[in-house]
């Protein structure tokens, strides 16, 4: 069951000041990641209790550097990502296919239960764990033609990050999509109940 909107990612440069004061948000650590379009900066803003989280993203250099103000992605929070994945896959949701090598690498990086690893792989769910044992699960849809994509997330054990370790995997999976890919929602099955 989806319990709410977890994160909304927006362009970084034009919106940071807008969100800081009026909404009582504070900056978290800024992360920089290399991408084919240039260096991507991601600045997380949160309320003190973490009930509102906004990730501002921007390409700092390269041909894709832009001051666009459109929403780039929306993440929805769930209490059970595997149940939500099953409901979505039975409906119109098309998950972003995760490369097979990701799960082999994941098994090497974390001491993981084989059943959990198999469940992640079967549902194209990404995983991260912090130094305190907090866990983060991510499920992405295929992007819309505008570039907007949706994500389902589940946090366990106080994980407070955004899964930055999985960002290169998501970008790699996107790069492997065929030019004429399916849409994230099949119009014949466009009604989803979660």
Task: Tell what function each PLM region has.
Residues 11-27:
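Amphipathic alpha-helical segments
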Residues 28-30, 60-65:
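ER-lumen resident redox/N-glycosylation machinery signature
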Residues 9, 35, 56-60:
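Contiguous mid-protein beta-loop-alpha structural module that forms a pocket-lining wall or clamp
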Residues 81-84:
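Extended, hydrophobic alpha-helical segments in both membrane/secreted and soluble proteins
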